[in-house]
UniProtKB/Swiss-Prot annotation:
It is a peripheral membrane protein. Transmembrane segments: none annotated. It catalyses: a 1-acyl-sn-glycero-3-phosphate + a 1,2-diacyl-sn-glycero-3-phospho-(1'-sn-glycerol) = 1-acyl-sn-glycero-3-phospho-(1'-sn-glycerol) + a 1,2-diacyl-sn-glycero-3-phosphate; 1-hexadecanoyl-2-(9Z,12Z-octadecadienoyl)-sn-glycero-3-phospho-(1'-sn-glycerol) + 1-(9Z-octadecenoyl)-sn-glycero-3-phosphate = 1-(9Z)-octadecenoyl-2-(9Z,12Z)-octadecadienoyl-sn-glycero-3-phosphate + 1-hexadecanoyl-sn-glycero-3-phospho-(1'-sn-glycerol); 1'-[1,2-diacyl-sn-glycero-3-phospho],3'-[1-acyl-sn-glycero-3-phospho]-glycerol + a 1,2-diacyl-sn-glycero-3-phosphocholine = a cardiolipin + a 1-acyl-sn-glycero-3-phosphocholine; 1-hexadecanoyl-2-(9Z,12Z-octadecadienoyl)-sn-glycero-3-phosphocholine + 1-hexadecanoyl-sn-glycero-3-phosphocholine = 2-(9Z,12Z-octadecadienoyl)-sn-glycero-3-phosphocholine + 1,2-dihexadecanoyl-sn-glycero-3-phosphocholine. This is Tafazzin. A motif (HXXXXD motif) lies at residues 69-74. GO terms for biological process: cardiolipin acyl-chain remodeling; heart development; heart looping; inner mitochondrial membrane organization; positive regulation of heart contraction. Its EC number is 2.3.1.-. At 10 hours post-fertilization (hpf), expressed ubiquitously, including in cardiac progenitor regions, with strongest expression in the head area. By 24 hpf, highly expressed in the head, eyes, and tail. By 30 hpf, expression is restricted to the head, heart, eyes, and the region next to the yolk corresponding to endodermal tissue. At 51 hpf, expression is restricted to the heart. One of its GO terms (cellular component) is mitochondrial inner membrane. Pfam families: Acyltransferase. Pathway: Phospholipid metabolism.
Length: 262
Protein backbone atom coordinates (compact mmCIF):
# COMPACT_ATOMS: atom_id res chain seq x y z
CA UNK A 1 0.00 0.00 0.00
CA UNK A 2 1.70 3.26 -1.09
CA UNK A 3 2.09 6.35 1.06
CA UNK A 4 -0.78 8.77 0.33
CA UNK A 5 1.50 11.83 0.33
CA UNK A 6 4.91 12.60 -1.11
CA UNK A 7 7.88 11.51 0.98
CA UNK A 8 8.18 14.39 3.47
CA UNK A 9 11.88 14.44 4.33
CA UNK A 10 14.32 16.33 2.08
CA UNK A 11 17.69 14.75 1.40
CA UNK A 12 19.46 17.86 2.69
CA UNK A 13 17.12 19.94 4.89
CA UNK A 14 17.52 23.66 4.33
CA UNK A 15 17.66 26.28 7.06
CA UNK A 16 13.94 27.01 6.80
CA UNK A 17 13.09 23.35 7.31
CA UNK A 18 15.36 23.06 10.33
CA UNK A 19 13.97 26.20 11.92
CA UNK A 20 10.35 25.15 11.39
CA UNK A 21 11.15 21.68 12.73
CA UNK A 22 12.72 23.17 15.85
CA UNK A 23 9.63 25.34 16.39
CA UNK A 24 7.22 22.41 15.97
CA UNK A 25 9.25 20.15 18.28
CA UNK A 26 9.70 22.88 20.87
CA UNK A 27 6.08 24.05 20.91
CA UNK A 28 4.61 20.55 21.06
CA UNK A 29 7.18 19.56 23.67
CA UNK A 30 6.35 22.63 25.75
CA UNK A 31 2.65 21.76 25.65
CA UNK A 32 3.44 18.20 26.80
CA UNK A 33 5.70 19.47 29.57
CA UNK A 34 3.08 21.85 30.92
CA UNK A 35 0.10 19.53 30.48
CA UNK A 36 1.57 16.45 32.12
CA UNK A 37 3.55 18.16 34.90
CA UNK A 38 1.33 21.08 35.87
CA UNK A 39 -2.19 20.29 34.70
CA UNK A 40 -1.89 16.68 35.82
CA UNK A 41 0.10 14.82 38.48
CA UNK A 42 3.22 13.17 37.02
CA UNK A 43 5.42 10.73 38.94
CA UNK A 44 8.54 9.49 37.15
CA UNK A 45 10.72 6.71 38.56
CA UNK A 46 14.39 6.47 37.51
CA UNK A 47 14.00 9.65 35.46
CA UNK A 48 17.74 10.43 35.53
CA UNK A 49 18.47 7.31 33.50
CA UNK A 50 16.52 8.68 30.54
CA UNK A 51 17.73 12.26 30.96
CA UNK A 52 21.38 11.20 31.06
CA UNK A 53 21.06 8.99 27.99
CA UNK A 54 19.47 11.80 26.02
CA UNK A 55 22.20 14.25 27.06
CA UNK A 56 25.38 12.30 27.65
CA UNK A 57 25.62 9.10 25.61
CA UNK A 58 28.52 9.01 23.08
CA UNK A 59 27.79 10.43 19.61
CA UNK A 60 28.25 7.03 17.98
CA UNK A 61 25.78 5.32 20.32
CA UNK A 62 22.13 5.25 19.18
CA UNK A 63 19.29 5.16 21.69
CA UNK A 64 16.08 3.17 21.27
CA UNK A 65 13.35 3.79 23.83
CA UNK A 66 10.32 1.51 23.92
CA UNK A 67 7.12 1.89 25.89
CA UNK A 68 3.54 0.69 25.98
CA UNK A 69 0.80 2.43 24.00
CA UNK A 70 -2.33 3.42 25.97
CA UNK A 71 -3.59 6.50 24.15
CA UNK A 72 -3.27 8.11 20.73
CA UNK A 73 -1.38 11.01 22.36
CA UNK A 74 1.10 8.98 24.41
CA UNK A 75 3.57 10.72 22.15
CA UNK A 76 3.90 13.68 22.74
CA UNK A 77 2.51 13.52 26.32
CA UNK A 78 5.19 11.06 27.47
CA UNK A 79 7.92 13.64 26.79
CA UNK A 80 6.70 15.78 29.63
CA UNK A 81 9.24 13.71 31.60
CA UNK A 82 12.15 15.46 29.83
CA UNK A 83 13.86 18.70 30.76
CA UNK A 84 12.46 21.81 29.10
CA UNK A 85 15.75 22.59 27.35
CA UNK A 86 15.88 19.07 25.89
CA UNK A 87 12.49 19.56 24.28
CA UNK A 88 13.86 22.53 22.33
CA UNK A 89 17.06 20.77 21.27
CA UNK A 90 16.18 19.41 17.83
CA UNK A 91 19.34 17.34 17.51
CA UNK A 92 18.73 15.48 20.76
CA UNK A 93 15.04 14.75 20.39
CA UNK A 94 13.58 11.47 19.23
CA UNK A 95 12.40 10.19 15.87
CA UNK A 96 9.35 7.95 15.97
CA UNK A 97 7.54 5.70 13.47
CA UNK A 98 3.99 6.95 12.92
CA UNK A 99 0.95 5.37 11.29
CA UNK A 100 0.68 6.83 7.80
CA UNK A 101 -3.09 6.25 7.62
CA UNK A 102 -3.61 8.55 10.61
CA UNK A 103 -0.99 11.30 10.41
CA UNK A 104 0.11 11.31 6.76
CA UNK A 105 -3.12 11.42 4.77
CA UNK A 106 -2.81 15.06 3.63
CA UNK A 107 0.17 17.16 2.62
CA UNK A 108 -0.47 19.71 5.38
CA UNK A 109 -0.60 16.99 8.04
CA UNK A 110 2.51 15.41 6.55
CA UNK A 111 4.36 18.72 6.71
CA UNK A 112 3.49 19.18 10.38
CA UNK A 113 4.19 15.66 11.63
CA UNK A 114 7.41 15.26 9.66
CA UNK A 115 8.74 18.46 11.21
CA UNK A 116 7.89 16.85 14.54
CA UNK A 117 10.31 14.03 13.62
CA UNK A 118 7.49 11.56 12.98
CA UNK A 119 8.30 9.06 10.23
CA UNK A 120 5.46 7.57 8.16
CA UNK A 121 5.14 3.80 8.36
CA UNK A 122 2.52 2.03 6.26
CA UNK A 123 0.63 -0.62 8.21
CA UNK A 124 0.78 -4.01 6.53
CA UNK A 125 3.84 -3.21 4.42
CA UNK A 126 6.16 -5.17 6.70
CA UNK A 127 9.58 -4.39 8.12
CA UNK A 128 11.12 -3.51 4.73
CA UNK A 129 9.66 -0.17 3.71
CA UNK A 130 10.94 3.37 3.24
CA UNK A 131 10.01 4.59 6.71
CA UNK A 132 11.87 1.74 8.39
CA UNK A 133 14.88 2.28 6.12
CA UNK A 134 14.88 5.95 7.13
CA UNK A 135 14.78 5.06 10.83
CA UNK A 136 17.64 2.62 10.37
CA UNK A 137 19.69 5.43 8.79
CA UNK A 138 18.98 7.60 11.83
CA UNK A 139 20.21 4.86 14.15
CA UNK A 140 23.36 4.50 12.08
CA UNK A 141 23.96 8.21 12.71
CA UNK A 142 23.77 7.64 16.48
CA UNK A 143 20.36 9.27 16.92
CA UNK A 144 17.42 8.49 19.22
CA UNK A 145 14.35 6.57 18.09
CA UNK A 146 11.26 5.98 20.20
CA UNK A 147 9.06 3.00 19.37
CA UNK A 148 5.69 1.75 20.56
CA UNK A 149 6.52 -1.89 19.86
CA UNK A 150 2.94 -3.11 20.25
CA UNK A 151 2.25 -1.41 16.93
CA UNK A 152 -1.07 0.17 17.92
CA UNK A 153 -2.97 1.61 20.87
CA UNK A 154 -3.63 -1.21 23.32
CA UNK A 155 -7.07 -0.56 24.78
CA UNK A 156 -7.34 -3.87 26.65
CA UNK A 157 -4.40 -3.28 28.97
CA UNK A 158 -3.26 -6.86 28.42
CA UNK A 159 0.33 -7.45 27.36
CA UNK A 160 0.60 -7.72 23.58
CA UNK A 161 3.32 -9.43 21.59
CA UNK A 162 5.61 -6.79 20.15
CA UNK A 163 6.19 -6.36 16.43
CA UNK A 164 9.31 -7.45 14.57
CA UNK A 165 10.17 -3.97 13.28
CA UNK A 166 12.33 -3.24 16.30
CA UNK A 167 14.14 -6.52 15.71
CA UNK A 168 15.05 -5.46 12.19
CA UNK A 169 16.31 -2.04 13.29
CA UNK A 170 18.60 -3.54 15.91
CA UNK A 171 19.75 -6.53 13.89
CA UNK A 172 20.72 -4.41 10.88
CA UNK A 173 22.11 -1.38 12.72
CA UNK A 174 25.83 -0.90 12.05
CA UNK A 175 26.24 0.44 15.60
CA UNK A 176 25.15 -1.03 18.92
CA UNK A 177 22.16 0.91 20.28
CA UNK A 178 21.30 1.28 23.93
CA UNK A 179 17.77 0.05 24.53
CA UNK A 180 15.73 1.65 27.28
CA UNK A 181 12.32 0.18 28.18
CA UNK A 182 9.67 2.30 29.88
CA UNK A 183 6.14 1.68 31.09
CA UNK A 184 3.54 4.32 31.79
CA UNK A 185 0.09 4.24 33.39
CA UNK A 186 -2.58 6.93 33.31
CA UNK A 187 -2.07 8.40 29.84
CA UNK A 188 -5.43 6.99 28.78
CA UNK A 189 -7.01 8.96 31.63
CA UNK A 190 -5.42 12.15 30.32
CA UNK A 191 -6.75 11.41 26.82
CA UNK A 192 -9.37 8.62 26.88
CA UNK A 193 -9.81 6.50 23.77
CA UNK A 194 -13.32 7.78 23.18
CA UNK A 195 -15.00 10.94 22.01
CA UNK A 196 -14.63 13.77 22.66
CA UNK A 197 -10.86 13.51 22.20
CA UNK A 198 -10.00 16.37 24.55
CA UNK A 199 -7.07 16.11 27.01
CA UNK A 200 -8.14 16.13 30.64
CA UNK A 201 -6.62 17.69 33.74
CA UNK A 202 -6.18 16.45 37.29
CA UNK A 203 -5.20 12.90 36.35
CA UNK A 204 -2.39 10.82 37.86
CA UNK A 205 0.38 9.56 35.58
CA UNK A 206 3.10 7.10 36.52
CA UNK A 207 6.15 6.55 34.31
CA UNK A 208 8.66 3.83 35.16
CA UNK A 209 11.99 4.03 33.37
CA UNK A 210 13.68 0.64 33.26
CA UNK A 211 17.32 -0.38 33.10
CA UNK A 212 19.20 0.33 29.85
CA UNK A 213 20.71 -2.65 28.08
CA UNK A 214 22.22 -3.72 24.78
CA UNK A 215 21.87 -6.89 22.73
CA UNK A 216 25.36 -6.65 21.28
CA UNK A 217 26.29 -10.10 22.54
CA UNK A 218 23.16 -11.63 21.04
CA UNK A 219 23.48 -9.90 17.66
CA UNK A 220 27.16 -10.82 17.37
CA UNK A 221 26.39 -14.46 18.18
CA UNK A 222 23.57 -14.61 15.63
CA UNK A 223 25.78 -13.07 12.95
CA UNK A 224 28.56 -15.52 13.72
CA UNK A 225 26.10 -18.37 13.20
CA UNK A 226 24.92 -16.89 9.88
CA UNK A 227 21.36 -16.79 11.19
CA UNK A 228 18.86 -15.87 8.47
CA UNK A 229 17.32 -12.36 8.74
CA UNK A 230 13.85 -13.57 9.70
CA UNK A 231 15.07 -15.71 12.58
CA UNK A 232 17.45 -12.98 13.66
CA UNK A 233 14.66 -10.40 13.87
CA UNK A 234 12.49 -12.81 15.83
CA UNK A 235 15.22 -13.72 18.32
CA UNK A 236 16.13 -10.09 18.98
CA UNK A 237 12.47 -9.10 19.33
CA UNK A 238 11.79 -11.94 21.77
CA UNK A 239 14.73 -10.87 23.93
CA UNK A 240 13.50 -7.29 24.09
CA UNK A 241 9.95 -8.45 24.82
CA UNK A 242 11.12 -10.33 27.92
CA UNK A 243 12.87 -7.22 29.25
CA UNK A 244 9.89 -5.03 28.36
CA UNK A 245 7.28 -7.31 29.94
CA UNK A 246 8.96 -7.22 33.35
CA UNK A 247 8.16 -3.51 33.77
CA UNK A 248 4.39 -3.84 33.57
CA UNK A 249 3.74 -5.27 37.03
CA UNK A 250 6.28 -2.92 38.64
CA UNK A 251 4.67 0.15 37.09
CA UNK A 252 1.17 -0.98 38.09
CA UNK A 253 2.28 -1.47 41.70
CA UNK A 254 3.87 1.98 41.81
CA UNK A 255 0.77 3.58 40.31
CA UNK A 256 -1.58 1.87 42.77
CA UNK A 257 0.65 2.93 45.65
CA UNK A 258 0.46 6.52 44.44
CA UNK A 259 -3.33 6.37 44.22
CA UNK A 260 -3.66 4.86 47.69
CA UNK A 261 -1.53 7.62 49.24
CA UNK A 262 -3.57 10.45 47.75
Amino acid sequence: MPLEVTWPFPQCPRLGWRISSRVVMGMVGSYSYLWTKYFNSLMVHNQDVLLNLVDERPQDTPLITVCNHQSCMDDPHIWGVLKFRQLWNLNKMRWTPTASDICFTREFHSSFFSRGKCVPVVRGDGVYQKGMDFLLERLNQGEWIHIFPEGRVNMSGEFMRIKWGIGRLIAECSLHPIILPMWHIGMNDVLPNETPYIPRVGQRITVLVGKPFTVRHLVNALRAENTNPTEMRKTVTDYIQDEFRSLKAQAEALHHRLQNHT
